[in-house]
């Protein structure tokens, strides 16, 4: 009966016997694409579970730094934490100082927002300006920002409060630093740990 089907369809019996299926797979571009995709996915499934050998990647992150104790900073003290002089990266936003070290790719020396590292980034974030000249070296009271810029700054502050460790506040000239106890942790951070 199989021979009758071959004769009825007009196919050459030698084509079916000599790898007709393989011939069809390798002559159709769509089938080749699907075969390549299957091989790639199989490779990723099998190879993806194996950890990369140490030293293979240039993107190796340095080991995480210990959590910084809460303290307050003057603008001059903050400048040291730019990722170059000190491996830790701190930024001030709206008077609050955040440890953004885990965001080194963004805020580190080579990152797109590296200009803000070790500085009060409030004015730059509020005005969407990445120029170093827009940032002040002394305490910036931000009194000249518009209502829209203040709202933008508040949004940035909320994002940083949610994502990064709040380590203290930025001190005005002549302002005394707050003395924090070792057990003290802000309410927003303890709530974040419960998530």
Swiss-Prot record:
Transmembrane segments: 25-43
Domain of life: Eukaryota
Cytoplasmic side: 44-195
Annotated membrane topology: Single-pass membrane protein
One Pfam family named in its UniProt record: Cyt-b5
Location of Phosphothreonine modifications: 74
Sorted UniProt keywords: Endoplasmic reticulum, Glycoprotein, Iron, Lipid-binding, Membrane, Metal-binding, Microsome, Mitochondrion, Mitochondrion outer membrane, Phosphoprotein, Proteoglycan, Receptor, Secreted, Steroid-binding, Transmembrane, Transmembrane helix
Domain Cytochrome b5 heme-binding: 72-171
MF annotations from Gene Ontology: amyloid-beta binding; heme binding; metal ion binding; protein homodimerization activity; steroid binding
UniProt-annotated stretches for the region Disordered: 51-71, 173-195
SMART domains: Cyt-b5
GO cellular component labels: cell body; endomembrane system; endoplasmic reticulum; extracellular region; membrane; mitochondrial outer membrane; neuron projection; neuronal cell body
Misc. comment: Non-classical progesterone receptors involved in extranuclear signaling are classified in 2 groups: the class II progestin and adipoQ receptor (PAQR) family (also called mPRs) (PAQR5, PAQR6, PAQR7, PAQR8 and PAQR9) and the b5-like heme/steroid-binding protein family (also called MAPRs) (PGRMC1, PGRMC2, NENF and CYB5D2).
Protein name according to UniProt: Membrane-associated progesterone receptor component 1
Lineage of the organism: Eukaryota, Metazoa, Chordata, Craniata, Vertebrata
